[in-house]
């Protein structure tokens, strides 16, 4: 599989307490099938942060990768914006 075909997500770092691991919260809007209202959805991913460079509140891009642990299947590709 080519590297550019892997899934990518953009989200906000919600936790960096683990060593070389961050928790990224990804938000999106989804239309309710019956009522038609847009509902905010959130999903959390564990991602590999090799250099421990992310802080809480940073906006980051993560990419799908091979399983690195029981829950970790994503890795950090870039920090888009640092938290203020």
UniProtKB/Swiss-Prot annotation:
<keyword id="KW-0699">rRNA-binding</keyword>
<dbReference type="InterPro" id="IPR012340">
    <property type="entry name" value="NA-bd_OB-fold"/>
</dbReference>
<dbReference type="GO" id="GO:0003735">
    <property type="term" value="F:structural constituent of ribosome"/>
</dbReference>
<dbReference type="GO" id="GO:0019843">
    <property type="term" value="F:rRNA binding"/>
</dbReference>
<dbReference type="InterPro" id="IPR000266">
    <property type="entry name" value="Ribosomal_uS17"/>
</dbReference>
<comment type="function">
    <text>One of the primary rRNA binding proteins, it binds specifically to the 5'-end of 16S ribosomal RNA.</text>
</comment>
<keyword id="KW-0694">RNA-binding</keyword>
<comment type="similarity">
    <text>Belongs to the universal ribosomal protein uS17 family.</text>
</comment>
<dbReference type="GO" id="GO:0022627">
    <property type="term" value="C:cytosolic small ribosomal subunit"/>
</dbReference>
<dbReference type="Pfam" id="PF00366">
    <property type="entry name" value="Ribosomal_S17"/>
</dbReference>
<keyword id="KW-0689">Ribosomal protein</keyword>
<dbReference type="InterPro" id="IPR019984">
    <property type="entry name" value="Ribosomal_uS17_bact/chlr"/>
</dbReference>
<keyword id="KW-0687">Ribonucleoprotein</keyword>
<dbReference type="GO" id="GO:0006412">
    <property type="term" value="P:translation"/>
</dbReference>
<dbReference type="InterPro" id="IPR019979">
    <property type="entry name" value="Ribosomal_uS17_CS"/>
</dbReference>
<comment type="subunit">
    <text>Part of the 30S ribosomal subunit.</text>
</comment>
<protein>
    <recommendedName>
        <fullName>Small ribosomal subunit protein uS17</fullName>
    </recommendedName>
</protein>
